[in-house]
């Protein structure tokens, strides 16, 4: 950059700082880059697939899927994990369907959970914005976008047409909320439902409710599906679940994680620790027996997981090693890609300069 441009840029930056305050514009290299803080989902496999160890704070996340696929269970699991670290959490129950007893079984401290059951979509989103602006709430769940009914629709007649009202409401609210979420470093999760588009010949006919605004504003979008049943004998005790990361602004997208959700218990975390421990060579498997550091911990996966439940310190130790191994490997791969891109950019610059 020549001297005239440098002086013009310095003058512009000085004027911006005087008018809007210090830090309104900054060079990326002036500050040391920091990792994005994350809140665990309760699923070890999903945390690793997300690339940063969980869902990013200060961002909007959308979780969508068919009915009974585990959307609310996953969000309650996020709340339980956040509360373990002293976080304040809120649940905006637009569907009026939150079961405190079930939430308690998943590990949620129901007594400390803030709950709102708003009458209209406007009220729900205004409450969400006020909680964010308080800078005192760490996690907010909105369940669900489909239940955010505009006031005009509630007060109107049953057969009245209200085209695009909900989409406009979501677009306006997200424009207003996004900046506040970043400043408050608050994680806001919107649960969404699936609808079918009529007349689609090619591609997926599935879409989510509430227009396109949430698709753009969300930093992470998770597609959760039930893929099968977990049985003990003939009794169904849970469901096999697959989560696909269809959008991720903080790490590479399109990864997926599979785990089990047990009815009345939540995500089968110890089962995930066993599976990932075996795949990473931290847990030895010989026939039906599982061993850790030479000590047998159980015959069969169920017994090994039961051992970890009875000895949480060992489970936490294995989980810590898995996280360090897989998350560091992912970070190293990303750093390698970034270095390669920087090197190629330098080569192009040198070529243009005639070196």
UniProtKB/Swiss-Prot annotation:
Keyword DNA-binding: yes
Record keyword DNA-binding present: yes
Binding site for ATP: 65-72
One of the Pfam families matching this protein, by short name: RecA
SUPFAM superfamilies: P-loop containing nucleoside triphosphate hydrolases (SSF52540), RecA protein, C-terminal domain (SSF54752)
Family (UniProt): Belongs to the RecA family.
Domain of life: Bacteria
Source organism per UniProt: Pseudomonas putida (strain GB-1)
CDD domains linked to this entry: RecA
Function noted in UniProt: Can catalyze the hydrolysis of ATP in the presence of single-stranded DNA, the ATP-dependent uptake of single-stranded DNA by duplex DNA, and the ATP-dependent hybridization of homologous single-stranded DNAs. It interacts with LexA causing its activation and leading to its autocatalytic cleavage.
Protein's name in the database: Protein RecA
Disulphide linkage map: none
Classification via Gene3D superfamilies: P-loop containing nucleotide triphosphate hydrolases (3.40.50.300)
